């Protein structure tokens, strides 16, 4: 019989082993769709971003007008821009759900896959931050000023580091130019890290909702999961296009329709919604360095997940106490997100502080204790 080119060609063989003949657990649910959705988000963002970059000018005097020009005068420029801006929101929705899935089902026990995933999250956050600065509106400028300024809290080298990052003594033209360069570069770094992430995942194979070894019951990725993924794509693109076409500015800040002005500070400086939980944690500590450390810890704590797993069972599927704790954590994150969008005044200050404390307590203390307790209750 003639050899199948899909299985013999050096390049097609890799595609085949990753997307066609890949053995996948037969019982993975829709929660396993978010990986492929993130891949599609990345491709969409790179494509729309490339088209936007063709019309963008990274100069403080022209940046704002160049974005306006794209929306007014470029064929479907408004659509490309709206898809790119709201695509970022969907990227974060997908990555947060993807991480939540990993946390619930104990996927973090694949340490290499999990760690590359956390690095991917950090890179995505950096990309979104530098990208938000590019339209050079008021919130772009002041957001960049506030967040880059946080590095000055680092003892001894802080101030030097900030001025080095700015390329001067304040956020100005050199800052915008380098942020554009970084915003162009980082998505390709994300693409590279994604391949590493997948390489590690395919070493072990996927986890599944039962959290048990599924080698005895695997099915080919194609057609079962290719079809399921396509359904996922459709279900994601529907709300994305609806948002981009009907209310493209719903998630944005009205302040960003005003060109950047270093002499006027907006009344409430706040990031996009997907950073609000971390922003609330940052603000809940009255000390600058303490806030910066808490901000870093809010994401870096994910690296500790594999070491804090004390339960004998992998997934939370059959662990009701851990489930309760997990959903309390989710509710807590919603509270942090809401507090981050509110002004710094009573009662939001104390709510933010309590929610921040709860966040770290659940992750670092209550999850391991509950896991150990469930072992006792189940006579492990």
Swiss-Prot record:
Name listed for the protein in its UniProt record: Cytochrome b
CDD domains with a match to the protein in the record: cytochrome_b_C (cd00290), Cytochrome_b_N (cd00284)
Primary gene name: MT-CYB
Cofactor or coenzyme needed: heme b
UniProt xrefs under Pfam families: Cytochrom_B_C, Cytochrome_B
Spans traversing the lipid bilayer: 34-54, 78-99, 114-134, 179-199, 227-247, 289-309, 321-341, 348-368
Keywords in alphabetical order: Electron transport, Heme, Iron, Membrane, Metal-binding, Mitochondrion, Mitochondrion inner membrane, Respiratory chain, Transmembrane, Transmembrane helix, Transport, Ubiquinone
Entry superkingdom: Eukaryota
One GO MF term attached to the UniProt entry: ubiquinol-cytochrome-c reductase activity
Lineage: Eukaryota, Metazoa, Chordata, Craniata, Vertebrata
Membrane topology: Multi-pass membrane protein
Residues involved in a ubiquinone binding: 202
Family: Belongs to the cytochrome b family.
InterPro entries according to UniProt: Cyt_b/b6_C (IPR005798), Cyt_b/b6_C_sf (IPR036150), Cyt_b/b6_N (IPR005797), Cytb/b6-like_sf (IPR027387), Cytochrome_b (IPR030689), Cytochrome_b_C_euk/bac (IPR048260), Cytochrome_b_N_euk/bac (IPR048259), Di-haem_cyt_TM (IPR016174)
UniProt-listed SUPFAM superfamilies: a domain/subunit of cytochrome bc1 complex (Ubiquinol-cytochrome c reductase), Transmembrane di-heme cytochromes
Free-text comment on the cofactor: Binds 2 heme b groups non-covalently.
One of the record's GO cellular component terms: mitochondrial inner membrane
GO BP: mitochondrial electron transport, ubiquinol to cytochrome c
Binding site for heme b b562: 84, 183
Additional remark text: Heme 1 (or BL or b562) is low-potential and absorbs at about 562 nm, and heme 2 (or BH or b566) is high-potential and absorbs at about 566 nm.
SUBUNIT field: The cytochrome bc1 complex contains 11 subunits: 3 respiratory subunits (MT-CYB, CYC1 and UQCRFS1), 2 core proteins (UQCRC1 and UQCRC2) and 6 low-molecular weight proteins (UQCRH/QCR6, UQCRB/QCR7, UQCRQ/QCR8, UQCR10/QCR9, UQCR11/QCR10 and a cleavage product of UQCRFS1). This cytochrome bc1 complex then forms a dimer.
UniProt: heme b b566 binding residues: 98, 197
Localization (cell): Mitochondrion inner membrane
Reported function: Component of the ubiquinol-cytochrome c reductase complex (complex III or cytochrome b-c1 complex) that is part of the mitochondrial respiratory chain. The b-c1 complex mediates electron transfer from ubiquinol to cytochrome c. Contributes to the generation of a proton gradient across the mitochondrial membrane that is then used for ATP synthesis.
């Amino acid at each position: 019989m003639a050899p199948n080119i899909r299985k013999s060609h050096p390049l097609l063989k890799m595609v085949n082993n990753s997307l066609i003949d890949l053995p996948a657990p037969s019982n993975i649910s829709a929660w396993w769709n978010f990986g492929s959705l993130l891949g599609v988000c990345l491709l969409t963002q790179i494509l729309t971003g490339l088209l936007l970059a063709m019309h963008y000018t990274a100069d403080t005097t022209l940046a704002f007008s160049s974005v306006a020009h794209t929306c007014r005068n470029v064929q479907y420029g408004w659509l490309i821009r709206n898809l790119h801006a709201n695509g970022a929101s969907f990227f974060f929705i997908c990555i947060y759900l993807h991480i939540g899935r990993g946390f619930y089902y104990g996927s973090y026990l694949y340490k290499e896959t999990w760690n590359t995933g956390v690095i991917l999250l950090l890179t995505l956050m950096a990309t979104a931050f530098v990208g938000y600065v590019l339209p050079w509106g008021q919130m772009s400028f002041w957001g960049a000023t506030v967040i880059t300024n946080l590095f000055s809290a680092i003892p001894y080298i802080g101030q030097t580091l900030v001025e080095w990052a700015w390329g001067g003594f304040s956020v100005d033209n050199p800052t915008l130019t380098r942020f554009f360069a970084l915003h162009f570069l980082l998505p390709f770094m994300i693409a590279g890290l994604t391949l590493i992430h997948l390489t590690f995942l395919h070493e072990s194979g996927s986890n599944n909702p039962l959290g048990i070894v599924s080698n005895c019951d695997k099915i080919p990725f194609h057609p079962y999961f290719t079809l399921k993924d396509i359904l996922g794509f459709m279900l994601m693109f529907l709300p994305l296009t609806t948002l981009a076409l009907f209310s493209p500015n719903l998630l944005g800040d009205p302040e960003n329709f005003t060109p950047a002005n270093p002499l006027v500070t907006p009344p409430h400086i706040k990031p996009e919604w997907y950073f609000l939980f971390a922003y609330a944690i940052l603000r809940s500590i009255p000390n600058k360095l303490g806030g910066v450390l808490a901000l870093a810890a809010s994401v870096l704590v994910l690296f500790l997940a594999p070491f804090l797993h004390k339960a004998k069972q992998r997934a939370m599927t059959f662990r009701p106490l851990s489930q309760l704790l997990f959903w309390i954590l989710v509710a807590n994150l919603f509270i942090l997100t809401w507090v981050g969008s509110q002004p710094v005044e009573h009662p939001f200050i104390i709510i933010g502080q309590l929610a921040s404390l709860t966040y770290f307590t659940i992750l670092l203390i209550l999850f391991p204790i509950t896991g150990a307790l469930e072992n006792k209750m189940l006579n492990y």
